[in-house]
From Swiss-Prot:
Protein name: Tyrosine--tRNA ligase
Motif 'KMSKS' region, chain ranges: 235-239
Motif 'HIGH' region: chain residues: 42-51
Subunit structure: Homodimer.
Catalytic activity: tRNA(Tyr) + L-tyrosine + ATP = L-tyrosyl-tRNA(Tyr) + AMP + diphosphate + H(+)
Statement: the UniProt record of this protein carries the keyword Cytoplasm: yes
InterPro entries on file: aa-tRNA-synth_Ic (IPR002305), Rossmann-like_a/b/a_fold (IPR014729), S4_RNA-bd (IPR002942), S4_RNA-bd_sf (IPR036986), SYY-like_C (IPR054608), Tyr-tRNA-ligase (IPR002307), Tyr-tRNA-ligase_bac-type (IPR024088), Tyr-tRNA-ligase_bac_1 (IPR024107)
Gene Ontology process terms (BP): tyrosyl-tRNA aminoacylation
Recorded GO CC terms: cytosol
Binding-site list for ATP: K238
Lineage: Bacteria, Pseudomonadati, Pseudomonadota, Gammaproteobacteria, Enterobacterales
Keyword hit for Cell membrane: no
EC numbers: 6.1.1.1
Residue span(s) of domain S4 RNA-binding: 356-414
Amino acid sequence: MLTDTLIQEFQDRNLISQITNEIDLKNILLHNKISLYCGFDITADSLHVGHILPLLCLRRFQNLGHRPVILMGGGTSLIGDPSFKLLERQLNSIELVHTWKQKITKQLSLFLKFNVGKNNALIVDNYEWFKNINVLTFLRDIGKHFSINQMIVRDAIQRRIKRLDQGISFTEFSYNLLQAYDFYFLNKQLDVILQIGGSDQWGNIISGIDLIRRLHKKRAYGITVPLLTKKDGRKFGKTELDTIWLDKMKTSPYKFYQYWMNISDSDIYSFLKMFTFLSLSEIKALKDTTKPTELNSVKKILAEYLTNLVHGSNEVRAIQRITSSLFSGKFSEMKETDFFQLEQDGMPSVQLYNSGNLQQLLVYSRLALSRSHAKSMIVSNSVRINNIIQNNPFYILCNRDKMYHKYTLLSRGKKNFCLLCWTK
């Protein structure tokens, strides 16, 4: 892939939702190595799968000699981005945000290279420049360039204003100015000319481009990647129960792997283009030679690729052992050492100290959202204990459910498992 075809490559991989001044940007990339950035607000102690796509976009640029800059929103995380948020975010302390930042920094090295010379990836924190800004100076020098008329008609703001139960605070409303200033600051200090973000960031990116034009008389550019959602409207990276994190202590490698195995059949080839570095010709060959009934083999390629990227090859091999055991259906043939291996390999598990109510255990093991949800699954024959359907909603697990006096395999449907480990 040559530099002059980078934007075309992005388009062929469905990686561009919107782009500014496409012809100019293509010409710049043809003749120059640039610095570009993507911002991440620090709202938790781990990245999640929704962050993978923009990070891989930065990596594609870095592979061609461009310098990626990661902006950690240590400052803006204290405010909260209202973009496509229905409710105002809880504000976190400076100390907590700093602790989270340290954990996230380690995860970034999974995607970007920090020791390759001229185009080393760089991490910056906007708290470092916002902490010393005088509010009067900011409003006079920066605020005067923003039109309330333009800001208030943006979709994200309108959605919040129209909610009778939840408006928008000035704190969140001002976020647009802060992100625009980020782009201006990075352009001035590091010659960053391109910002990448999710499609929900388009308005903020345009504000930054306008601010650079007004204050620097220079051109800057923006690309947004698609904001992926599932068929039910849920944001990509979330299941019906929780978020899929990159931290193995928050989401087990097995659960991470299964998330990709469970994507819609209609998404698989698009996701291979977007989330892997397989060539487009390789992906086309897969599509041309794979029967509709064999799509799980293609999902396996995607799941193993991303699990290896985030968790490493050892975890992939461990997951292969788990899936081989679980989906063979031959639980009666499993040895005690096999169950122990499942526990060690990262299969979701919970400790059980005495007999347990099935509804309660389904909730505790995160196989159900609530006891009422658990009850409906049980009576609809969706719950199995050691691969045997249990449709009594008041069932109490007891000694006869133990295998080797210690293990019970609880499942919801065909793909969701939890290992109950009884303690003596």
